[in-house]
UniProtKB/Swiss-Prot annotation:
Keywords: Cell cycle, Chromosome, DNA damage, DNA repair, Nucleus, Phosphoprotein, Ubl conjugation. Residues 96-106 have a biased composition (Low complexity). GO terms for molecular function: chromatin-protein adaptor activity. The keyword Membrane does not apply. Residues 66-106, 156-198 are annotated as: Disordered. This is RAD9, HUS1, RAD1-interacting nuclear orphan protein 1. Residues 162-173 have a biased composition (Basic and acidic residues). Coiled coil: none annotated. It comes from Rattus norvegicus (Rat). A motif (D-box) lies at residues 123-130. One of its GO terms (biological process) is recombinational repair. Interacts (when phosphorylated by PLK1) with POLQ; promoting POLQ recruitment to DNA damage sites. Interacts with RAD1; interaction is direct and promotes association with the 9-1-1 (RAD9-RAD1-HUS1) complex. Interacts with RAD18. Interacts with TOPBP1. Interacts with UBE2N. Residues 69-87 have a biased composition (Basic residues).
Length: 235
């Protein structure tokens, strides 16, 4: 077997200096701090703790935070699990304007009514939107809710001076389409502004620079000062 290599000592010996440091021995783990020589005395004024926060509204008072101590560990868990719903620990702010408060109460009551109606209503089987079954249901329910005859948007209705004759429910059902929400033919978009005009046949093969200078081009061509190679495109 080959002889084992001797491990070298990693710790090197401390360097030795012939001269001692001028400022004395320096500590190994502490920075040298200079002594404080210049001190300034500032006149102090007593502070009244009761008047410091007199301008702060009670809803923004820091005492509310002391009632609900913060839990750092809980916040870390929330960051790890973002799907959990976060609950507000601080009291809601109250506003003085009555309009905003009334609108908020109306919104809350409407949401509760919608949730209750969704819970109470029996679940129906899902039906595609444009299936014949859904079209039949729409044609049954729509005539009862519509007071007048359904008119397509493309047909111009007469003015308000023309009186409408009373129509029987049988005629209403016949006049309505089988499915109101049926697919409509898309309207063709109107043509936009012309960005670049087409080149007329007279100017085919002529360079663009001479197309923009028609008077100069005709003048030089009549005088014979332009060769074909100067104004015609090479093919």
């Amino acid at each position: 077997m080959p002889p084992r290599k001797r491990r070298r000592q990693c710790q090197k010996a401390q360097l030795l200096f012939h001269q001692q440091p001028l400022e004395g021995p320096k500590p190994h783990y502490e920075s040298h701090q200079q002594p404080i020589t210049h001190t300034v005395q500032v006149p102090s004024k007593p502070i009244d703790q009761s008047t410091i926060t007199s301008w702060v509204l009670p809803q923004f008072d820091t005492a509310a935070e002391s009632r609900f101590p913060t839990h750092r560990k809980h916040h870390r868990d929330q960051a790890r699990h973002p799907t959990r719903r976060s609950t507000c620990k601080f009291p809601r702010l109250t506003f003085e304007s009555p309009e905003s408060s009334s609108s908020e109460t109306l919104l809350l009551s409407n949401r509760e009514q919608l949730q209750n109606s969704e819970k109470d209503a029996p679940r129906r089987p899902l039906v595609p939107l444009f299936s014949p079954q859904s079209c039949g249901e729409l044609s049954v329910h729509v005539p009862q809710s519509l007071p007048h005859v359904f008119m397509p948007p493309d047909i111009q209705t007469p003015g308000s001076s023309v009186r409408e004759d009373p129509i029987s429910p049988d005629q209403k059902e016949n006049s309505l389409p089988s499915c109101i929400l049926g697919p409509r033919t898309p309207r063709t978009p109107e043509p936009g502004p012309v960005l670049v005009k087409d080149t007329p046949e007279e100017k085919y093969g002529i360079k663009v620079t001479w197309r923009r200078r028609r008077h100069l081009f005709a003048y030089l061509k009549e005088r014979g000062k332009l060769d074909k190679s100067q104004f015609l495109v090479k093919t």
